[in-house]
Every structure is written in C-alpha cells, then in structure tokens.
UniProtKB/Swiss-Prot annotation:
Source species: Mesorhizobium japonicum (strain LMG 29417 / CECT 9101 / MAFF 303099) (Mesorhizobium loti (strain MAFF 303099))
Principal location listed in the UniProt entry: membrane
GO cellular component terms given for this protein: plasma membrane
Topology in the lipid bilayer: Single-pass type II membrane protein
Cytoplasmic side: 1-12
Residue ranges annotated as Periplasmic topological domain: 36-206
Protein name in the entry: Cytochrome c oxidase assembly protein CtaG
UniProt-recorded Gene Ontology molecular function terms: copper ion binding
Keyword hit for Methyltransferase: no
C-alpha cells in the first residue's frame, strides 16, 4: 500500500490555515466600520456626541460655555449652514439651535449628516436630545428646511482635568448625499435601506 508524501499533507494544511486567516481578515475589515461607529457613539471617542433620552441634565451650573456651530457639505448639492454662529449657555442648560438646508438641484435629494465636536474629549459630555442628524432628510428641488438640534452640556465636564478650563466647544456637521431605493420628495424623515453615494452620482442626480 502506497503512502502519500507527508510534505503534501503539510502543504495542504498550511494552505487551509492561510485561506481561513485571510477570509477572517476580510470579514473583520467589513465589520470594522460599523463596530468603530458603535464604539464612538458609546464612548464619545473621536469627538462623537452622545444621544440621550432625558431632556434635562438634572442640574445647571453657575458657569457659562459657548458652543460654536459649523456646517460642511460632501457631494450633496445643497446649501447647508447654521442659523446662528454661536450660543452661550449655562453648563447643564438645555438649549435649541438651528441649521438650514436648501436643495439647489433640479431633483429631490436625500441627505444624511455626520457630526462631531471639538475638543474631542468633550464628545461624551455633549448630549443631544433631538437632532436632524438622527434621521435622513429629503428635500424637493428648491426646498428649504429648518433643522433643529436640542442639546445640553453635561455638568460632569467640569470634573475632567483636561476640560475643566474649556470655555468653547465647536459642534460640526457634514452633510452627505444618500440614495434611496425609492425616490422620496419630502422633507419628512424617511425609512428604508440606503447607501452613501459618490460625488459623481450626486451631481447626476443619483
């Protein structure tokens, strides 16, 4: 009875291990983006703000802080800007700011906003109660919509050594185009599977 060379069996085992390794690496790469996003939202890492259920901090400090507002677009054919450039409020005080968006394209366009704050360490202490960034927004050609954000700065921010002397926080949004499975021509939040589209597709109307 003939025996298969041990070298061939060894090579097959090595090949199988390598294939499993590379397959696992590809899977981890695809999972990394949503996992990183979840991590940022849970911890405030990278300046990601927090979404909270309670509308009030529970206490308001006798100390003011200024929030500056920034707006950017990335391939979406909109005008997008804050209504106010800055607001000064008490730490722990719930306030509402407004952004405004206008669709400059000749077709309905859906946008999605990403956000962060500077300094990044302030992310876990910048609490949003309501925000247009929680859902996608669709605008008809030429339509303008008011986009409110209700928030407060957590009083615990003064207990962080690196933030105890911070007097200004910048809240920044970047608006991206979104392609829907079915065109929607409404400023109401829409449901359904969506994906971010490229600048070229946005310029062509999706």
């Amino acid at each position: 009875m003939s025996k298969k060379p041990a070298g061939k069996n060894s090579n097959r085992i090595v090949a199988a291990v390598c294939l499993a390794f590379f397959t696992g690496m590809i899977g981890m790469a695809y999972a990394a983006v949503p996992l990183y996003k979840m991590f940022c939202q849970a911890t405030g890492y990278g300046g990601t703000t927090q979404r909270v259920e309670k509308q009030y901090a529970g206490r308001v400090l006798d100390r003011e802080i200024t929030v500056r507002f920034d707006a950017n677009i990335a391939g979406v054919p909109w005008e997008f800007q804050p209504v106010q450039r800055s607001m000064t409020m008490k730490i722990g005080e719930t306030v509402q700011a407004h952004y405004q968006a206008t669709n400059k394209f000749d077709r309905p366009v859906t946008g999605r906003a990403t956000f962060n704050v500077q300094p990044e360490l302030a992310g876990p202490y910048f609490n949003k109660v309501e925000c247009f960034c929680f859902t996608d927004t669709s605008l008809k050609p030429g339509e303008t919509v008011d986009m409110p954000v209700l928030f407060y700065v957590d009083p615990d921010i003064v207990n962080v050594p690196e933030l105890k002397d911070v007097k200004t926080i910048t809240l920044s949004y970047t608006m991206f185009p979104v392609e829907k499975n079915k065109p929607v021509a409404s400023s109401e939040p829409v449901q359904g599977t969506s994906k971010i589209i490229s600048d070229t597709e946005a310029n062509l109307g999706g």
